[in-house]
Amino acid sequence: MTKSELIERLCAEQTHLSAKEVEDAVKDILEHMASTLESGDRIEIRGFGSFSLHYREPRVGRNPKTGDKVELEGKYVPHFKPGKELRERVNLGS
């Protein structure tokens, strides 16, 4: 599901809200989540999961085109850990 598909679905379910209000709410939520992670904090949504940053150590990679070794710097990457309820729902649906 894309962001625009999410907005469309929410608009269909929340008929008392305008499309602009729904779009603004979704954008605000995503912006707050991004800025929270940017500041190094963790996000926990009970029953859904948590978002945090994981550090990837520096390593030697390879250029897939040439095969040359490339030094890759360490970096932080967003990580999502699903909550118990979400894991159970996904497993029941498969």
UniProtKB/Swiss-Prot annotation:
Pfam families in the record: Bac_DNA_binding
GO aspect biological process, one term: positive regulation of bioluminescence
GO terms for cellular component: chromosome; cytosol
Keyword terms of this UniProt record: DNA recombination, DNA-binding, Transcription, Transcription regulation, Translation regulation
Gene Ontology MF: a single term: DNA binding
Function, as annotated: This protein is one of the two subunits of integration host factor, a specific DNA-binding protein that functions in genetic recombination as well as in transcriptional and translational control.
Subunit text: Heterodimer of an alpha and a beta chain.
Protein name (record): Integration host factor subunit beta
